[in-house]
């Protein structure tokens, strides 16, 4: 059974608790698996300061393929004549419902700000607006819990689906954001959705959203391009793109959620769409293991963390506001990258395509494995 690491000697409150209480940043767990629900591990994470859970098709694929905890339910569904893909959604929905129950006290005590768990629409719908809208609506109705986000990718086709779902009162986690331009579109979709609800006289207070801005993958891609750039200044720019871009995203967040337009919505009960820092594990072993936590601390944000990063942060992470302490420096880094021939918009497009493809492949591989398992059950 996985156990949360103890706090350092002499500590009375975990760093995760302090991160929220002192800095206003909510730490979430980037993993969901049925054994964690059954053996109490998720509850332990929550007691230690975790305030939400994220998952994606790769996480669900790893959870279902790597555990026998799903076998009995899957066998029962197949025996009922359910299609394999429909059986998958039943497995995933069951985990999300159970996780939402564990997190419900956090949701209630935070006034609906935290305590969320996410479930993503099928990855093959990432380039289909109408199908995404239909699938998101079905997931929302199927799970029917106030503290569940439906995840929609921030593709060009996903943007209008986000506005549509927000307008219908569905809380959305927008995922796979890799560029500032796309982030601007995500915020605009959220505001348009709220304005559509306001025009109908509908409640705005119950609609929540986070914008999942991916971090470490940006450095991985940019560092690779810097290695081949031939620019003599390139080595000094390695490992700087992701944090700089995320800090500029936070500035956009601050700008867009102030002013007359936002204040009109806020007066009707609307809540800000918080930036969620995703992909915050360190991919490059040369970088500190808490790099993408320590450097992005600030109020009204979320950081979703895999277990190893949680352990590292609890052991030696910092608790100092860092997201906007050097505002001019972030823009200067992107200027230097542009001078070195790095096109950040192209980086964003590349990573979006890779992210969509990776989730699609994970989902396809899982369905292949489940079909094989269903075939084995049919032979018994």
Predicted feature residues:
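Active-site beta->alpha loop and helix N-cap motifs at the rims of alpha/beta catalytic domains
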Residues: 59-61, 66-161, 167
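Short acidic, glycine/serine/threonine-rich loops at helix termini
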Residues: 39-41, 64-66, 129-133, 160-167, ...
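Catalytic alpha/beta core domains of metabolic enzymes, predominantly
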Residues: 171-308
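Flexible, acidic glycine-rich loops studded with aromatic residues
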Residues: 269-375
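Active-site beta-loop-alpha junctions enriched in small/polar residues
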Residues: 30-34, 58, 122-126, 153-157, ...
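N- or domain-start disorder-to-order transition segments that initiate the globular core
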Residues: 2-40
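Hydrophobic faces of well-ordered beta-strands that scaffold small-molecule active sites
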Residues: 25-31, 51-55, 115-121, 148-152, ...
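Generic structural signal for well-ordered alpha-helices
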Residues: 42, 93-104, 133-137, 162, ...
């Amino acid at each position: 059974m996985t156990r949360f690491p103890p706090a350092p000697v002499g500590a009375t409150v975990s760093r995760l608790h302090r991160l929220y209480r002192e800095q206003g940043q909510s730490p979430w767990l980037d993993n969901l698996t049925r054994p964690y629900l059954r053996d109490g591990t998720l509850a332990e994470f929550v007691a230690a300061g975790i305030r939400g859970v994220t998952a994606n098709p790769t996480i669900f694929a790893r959870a279902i393929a790597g555990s026998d905890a799903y076998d009995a339910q899957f066998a029962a569904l197949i025996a009922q004549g359910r299609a394999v893909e429909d059986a998958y959604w039943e497995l995933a929905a069951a985990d999300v419902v159970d996780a939402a129950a564990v997190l419900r006290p956090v949701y209630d005590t935070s006034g609906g700000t935290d305590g969320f768990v996410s479930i993503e629409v099928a990855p093959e719908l990432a380039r289909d607006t109408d199908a995404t809208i239909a699938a998101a609506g079905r997931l929302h109705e199927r799970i029917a819990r106030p503290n569940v986000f439906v995840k929609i990718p921030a593709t060009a086709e996903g943007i209008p689906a986000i506005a549509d779902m927000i307008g219908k009162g569905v809380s959305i986690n927008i995922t796979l954001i890799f560029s500032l331009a796309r982030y601007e579109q995500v915020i605009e979709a959220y505001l348009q959705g709220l304005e559509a609800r306001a025009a109908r006289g509908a409640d705005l207070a119950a609609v929540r959203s986070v914008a999942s801005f991916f971090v470490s993958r940006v450095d991985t891609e940019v560092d690779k391009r810097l290695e081949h750039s031939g620019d003599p200044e390139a080595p000094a720019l390695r490992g700087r793109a992701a944090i700089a871009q995320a800090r500029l995203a936070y500035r956009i967040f601050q700008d867009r959620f102030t002013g007359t337009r936002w204040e009109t919505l806020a007066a009707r009960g609307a809540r800000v769409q918080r930036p969620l820092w995703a992909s915050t594990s360190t991919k490059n072993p040369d970088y500190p293991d808490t790099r993408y936590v320590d450097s992005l601390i600030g109020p009204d944000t979320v950081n979703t963390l895999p277990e190893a990063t949680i352990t590292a942060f609890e052991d030696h992470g910092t608790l100092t506001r860092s997201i906007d302490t050097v505002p001019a420096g972030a823009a200067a880094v992107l200027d230097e990258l542009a001078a070195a021939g790095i096109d950040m918009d192209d980086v964003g497009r590349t990573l979006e395509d890779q992210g969509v493809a990776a989730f699609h492949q994970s989902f396809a591989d899982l369905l292949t494995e489940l079909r094989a398992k269903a075939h084995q059950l049919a032979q018994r």
